[in-house]
Design a protein with these regions (language model features):
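Perimembrane helix-loop-helix junctions
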Residues: 2-5, 151-154, 158, 162, ...
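Short acidic/glycine- and proline-prone juxtamembrane loop motifs at membrane-interface regions
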Residues: 35-36, 127-140
Length: 611
């Protein structure tokens, strides 16, 4: 018995979770296809690190994000070598550092049991292991957020750590400006938790560094903030606005796309979103908290998560720029929501009939949302499987399928029907889980720990299913023909492209965002800076001179560049560009270029030169 009490079971479970997280992250780092944001950040950052251009420089590269989003990965490549492999290995290091900070914080807030739970939530999350293993700013920001919270969250933090955390919060904002709302919340929390002296140090240090960053890049850094402010109220900032009609401004995006984006977010972040909602509903009264410090930490974390969630939900779902960014945007700040859950449930809950009823409704909504994510897999099946009783014209008792009801009564298109069917299937599974939870609690199969409370036991059951289902359902889906050789194949294709273009050539780029990182392997060639974006640098209308100053371009400029370029890199699927214009024009000569093994999992690029 003495050995059993000392056996480090929780520690072993935690370590196994960490090992699984590392293993899955390594897999995704070596197999995930590159995306436009990754390539654009890496390429622009490398150009900035080499001193060829500077962030916010007129007639340079479009700096639509805070400077450190480019400079940090840029200098990593400048110091350790340019390429996708080097950048992703750095992203892995940042991811593992973040995980260590999360473990430290959950231990502080909830103890080692919660630390083990959180470790496995990260390890089983496809979203966490895939996003944080790519060279994207989400991983940088999440790591900074985690460690500034290590420095500032809780009682009796040393003043030096409070100042360090405050400075790190500014560095975080200068990596992604969308985290700006966190700055005042952190300073207010430090005043509240650590007192006036610590608060003044926090305010002074963060304000000084914030001003210093702006002084370095003044005045063009105001491009970051001018787009957030109403143009009618701030005409004095028009010099920092491109005053252009972007291509995405003309898109017509239907509500189905928004609904599916929400479903993706629920599937990717089920534990955090559902757990956060449950923690709000069951939030314990102030007198039940173990300490005032934990209560203050929970309030701060909850307000931070809600503020950032609302801000990023508006930016994604209610704007045209990136509807499908609802889930990726949450990767910046989901740590705050996770720590809120730990903080609340490690201090107990407050339950009542009203809270219980509200919790059931919320859980069923999340179950329906999770079900709707799988509409392509279970949509058609659900339309036939779900049956409603009815009496036919002959007075006979029979059944009608959900598909028949939605077709003949509501006249809905098949795509909508499949989403409704999948959501209803998810809700029915949720009802089944409620019944299972009631049976377990009713017959006292769980008598200790969190199982003593029916509401918390039910929430735990839903969270368990929401964590386990995605990796189980998606097993094998992430494999590509390139498998874990993707980085090797990408490097081979990048070097082959570099070998095909002579030094000092002026290159016209019309590749996809997934191809941008191939440019990292090219030295001593010149590009038209506005073309090197993830597709967002193109505008439909605007003054050409003004656009060029901001690093943007339109059709008129594109035609001019086509006339002056030496080499042309073309992707067949590029909008407003027809590959046949180059293949059938005698002015352009095809250049032999073989993407070799990368062509198994990536679209082919075509290379031409001016005759």
């Amino acid at each position: 018995m003495k050995f059993a009490r000392k056996f480090p079971l929780i520690e072993i479970i935690t370590i196994l979770g960490a090992i699984l997280y590392v293993a899955r992250s390594l897999y995704f780092a070596h197999s995930s296809l590159s995306i436009g944001d990754e390539g654009a950040y890496l390429f622009k950052g490398l150009v900035f690190a080499r001193g060829e251009f500077a962030p916010f420089e007129d007639y340079g590269y479009w700096t639509n994000k805070a400077p450190l989003a480019f400079l940090i990965p840029g200098y990593i490549q400048y110091w350790f070598g340019a390429g996708l492999r080097e950048a992703r290995y750095f992203a892995l290091a940042i991811s593992f550092l973040m995980l260590a900070g999360v473990w430290k914080l959950t231990n502080r807030l909830g103890g080692k049991n919660w630390a083990a739970v959180v470790m496995w939530v990260f390890a089983l999350s496809d979203a966490n292991t895939s996003f944080y293993s790519q060279a994207l700013s989400q991983g940088l920001v999440a790591c900074m957020l985690t460690w500034l919270l290590v420095c500032t969250l809780g009682e009796k933090r040393p003043l030096s750590q409070i100042i360090l955390g405050s400075l790190l919060s500014v560095v975080m904002v200068m990596t992604r400006q969308n985290m700006i709302v966190f700055l005042p919340l952190l300073v207010l929390y430090i005043f509240w938790q650590h007192g006036k002296q610590a608060g003044m140090w926090s305010l002074a240090s963060s304000a000084t560094l914030f001003i210093l960053f702006h002084a370095i890049y003044w005045p063009n850094i105001m491009q970051l903030w001018s787009l957030w402010l109403p143009e009618s109220l701030t005409p004095f900032l028009n010099d920092f606005r491109p005053l252009a009609v972007f291509g995405y401004d003309t898109f017509e995006i239907g509500n189905l796309s928004r609904i599916q984006s929400v479903a993706i977010g629920i599937q990717h972040h089920f534990f955090i979103l559902c757990g956060f909602a449950g923690a709000l509903i069951l939030f314990p009264s102030k007198s039940n908290w173990k300490s005032q410090s934990q209560f203050k930490a929970a309030i701060f974390l909850g307000l931070s998560f809600i503020s950032l969630f609302l801000m990023h939900t508006w930016a994604s779902l209610f704007n045209q720029f990136c509807i499908q960014c609802f889930s990726p945007y949450q990767m910046f700040y989901s740590v705050a929501g996770l720590l809120f859950i730990v903080s609340v449930f490690s201090n107990g809950i407050s339950d009542s009939k009203i809270r219980r009823a509200l919790l059931i409704v919320v859980l069923l909504l999340f179950a329906a949302g999770l079900g709707s994510y799988y509409f392509q897999r279970i949509g058609e099946w659900s339309l036939a499987a779900i049956q409603f009783p009815r009496v036919d014209d002959a007075g006979q008792f029979t059944f009608a399928s959900l598909g028949e009801v939605l077709t003949y009564i509501f006249n809905l298109p098949l795509d909508v029907q499949k989403r409704i069917g999948a959501a209803l299937t998810g809700a029915l599974v949720g009802i089944l889980l409620l019944i299972v939870s009631w049976i377990i609690h009713r017959f006292a199969l769980i008598k200790n720990g969190m199982g003593q409370n029916a509401s918390l036991a039910t929430l735990n059951l839903f969270l368990l299913v929401g964590v386990i289902l995605p990796p189980a359902a998606n097993a094998g889906m992430y494999a590509t023909p390139c498998s874990t050789n993707f980085l090797t194949y990408y490097e081979q294709a990048g070097h082959a492209l570099a070998d095909a273009i002579p030094p000092d050539s002026l290159v016209y780029w019309k590749g996809s965002g997934r191809h941008i990182a191939m440019l990292l392997y090219m030295d001593d060639v010149r590009f038209f800076p506005p073309q090197i974006t993830a597709g967002a640098g193109y505008v439909r209308a605007g003054d050409p001179e003004r656009l060029l100053r901001f690093g943007l371009f339109n059709d008129e400029m594109d035609l001019q560049w086509r006339e002056s370029a030496d080499y042309f890199i073309i992707w067949k699927g590029y909008p407003n560009t027809d590959l046949k214009d180059f293949q059938n024009d005698a002015r352009y000569e095809p250049v032999p270029f073989d993407m070799e093994n990368l062509a198994q999992c990536e679209d082919v690029l075509y290379l031409f030169r001016k005759r």
